[in-house]
Amino acid sequence: MDRRTETGFQKFADIGGDFTDLLRVADSLRDDVKLIFTSHSENTGDAINPHWTLKTVGKLVSEKVTPEGLFTYVFYAMAVPGDGDRMDYKFLTNADGEHVAKTPMGMFEDLYIDNDLAKIIEVIDEYNEGE
């Protein structure tokens, strides 16, 4: 918001660069550090053909950088019908045609998993260690 009165394209180029730098910081961390980015999502499609992606500032980051492409694992949090009138909160593990999500083949058997980050980290560690 500090640059809200600034006109021109440069501020968006700066924001895009800063955003990309932030996402790439994970590559410089120790292997034992677990870094989880969370974000809001936005519908870049329409009401009939929705396409939910990571929300960004402006089109530069989403169209030129594609933030999801900088990650090996992308989970999409969803509320899905549970028992009766109850909703269950789950993570989508791979794209379903409307939501962006991705994990390596064979990491998760189910499309929806429990909303449990500790369990996800455990599964990722086991997968990467070849267990």
Language model feature labels by segment:
Residues M1-V65:
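P-loop NTPase motor core
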Residues N43-E131:
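Conserved GTP-binding G-domain of TRAFAC-class P-loop NTPases and closely related GTPase folds
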